[in-house]
Amino acid sequence: MQRFEWKQRNHEPQDLGLIPMVIETSGRGERAYDIYSRLLRERVIFLVGPVTEASANLIVAQLLFLESENADKDIHFYINSPGGLVSAGMAVYDTMQFIKPDVSTLCIGQAASMGSLLLAAGAKGKRFCLPNSRVMIHQPLGGFQGQASDIEIHAREILYLKNRLNELLSKHTGQSMETIERDTDRDNFLGAEDSVKYGLVDAVLTSRGEGAG
């Protein structure tokens, strides 16, 4: 038997604010979980809000934990993010590719910037979005102040990251590098059906039975 309560949680890695608690009752008594921990038991993890070092570390830890629990069962990764730090996002991306279980991705709301790469990086055939979700791809943003030599170093790094991210988008979408470079030159928003056509996701889901966990 389960019931819900609401409690304020402080210092949440993804700054989720008020978190519902699930109270499970059994013959041994009651046990409380926050809703995200309860869903983690069902192999569901979330990226909510910006991609930061804290949120990325949390997601990496959950991916590794779920692999240790069952290396043959899919993990379901729900994304609602405006993007964020490239280095943090790449930590999540590399872990998704590293672990053995397939990671099925689902866009709810938006997957922009680094969020769009993580969406596209799910297991082939298991990348989804909901009908009214939005996906945005673009080139990485950066700014730096300092000595001219340091600015030059950071400019080279930004150009490297731009090329690397384009290579990864090309790999996961099947689009050519030339197409990716053109389409990411400015903010490029795509709806659900256009995201399927572009290769960012495999299908648009309108109900649970169509494929998502």
Curated annotation (Swiss-Prot):
Gene3D superfamilies named among the record's database cross-references: 2-enoyl-CoA Hydratase, Chain A, domain 1 (3.90.226.10)
EC number: 3.4.21.92
Top-level division of the source organism's lineage: Bacteria
SUPFAM superfamilies in the record: ClpP/crotonase
Cited InterPro entries: ClpP (IPR001907), ClpP/crotonase-like_dom_sf (IPR029045), ClpP/TepA (IPR023562), ClpP_His_AS (IPR033135), ClpP_Ser_AS (IPR018215)
GO biological-process terms attached to the record: protein quality control for misfolded or incompletely synthesized proteins
Catalyzed reactions per annotation: Hydrolysis of proteins to small peptides in the presence of ATP and magnesium. alpha-casein is the usual test substrate. In the absence of ATP, only oligopeptides shorter than five residues are hydrolyzed (such as succinyl-Leu-Tyr-|-NHMec, and Leu-Tyr-Leu-|-Tyr-Trp, in which cleavage of the -Tyr-|-Leu- and -Tyr-|-Trp bonds also occurs)
Active-site residues annotated for this sequence: S113, H138
A Pfam cross-reference name: CLP_protease
The keyword Protease appears for this protein: yes
Subcellular location: Cytoplasm
GO CC terms of this entry: cytoplasm; endopeptidase Clp complex
GO MF, one example: ATP-dependent peptidase activity
Alphabetical UniProt keywords: Cytoplasm, Hydrolase, Protease, Serine protease
UniProt key word Cytoplasm: yes
Quaternary assembly: Fourteen ClpP subunits assemble into 2 heptameric rings which stack back to back to give a disk-like structure with a central cavity, resembling the structure of eukaryotic proteasomes.
Primary role: Cleaves peptides in various proteins in a process that requires ATP hydrolysis. Has a chymotrypsin-like activity. Plays a major role in the degradation of misfolded proteins.
Family statement: Belongs to the peptidase S14 family.
Name listed for the protein in its UniProt record: ATP-dependent Clp protease proteolytic subunit
Native organism: Nitrosospira multiformis (strain ATCC 25196 / NCIMB 11849 / C 71)
Lineage, top ranks: Bacteria, Pseudomonadati, Pseudomonadota, Betaproteobacteria, Nitrosomonadales
Gene: clpP
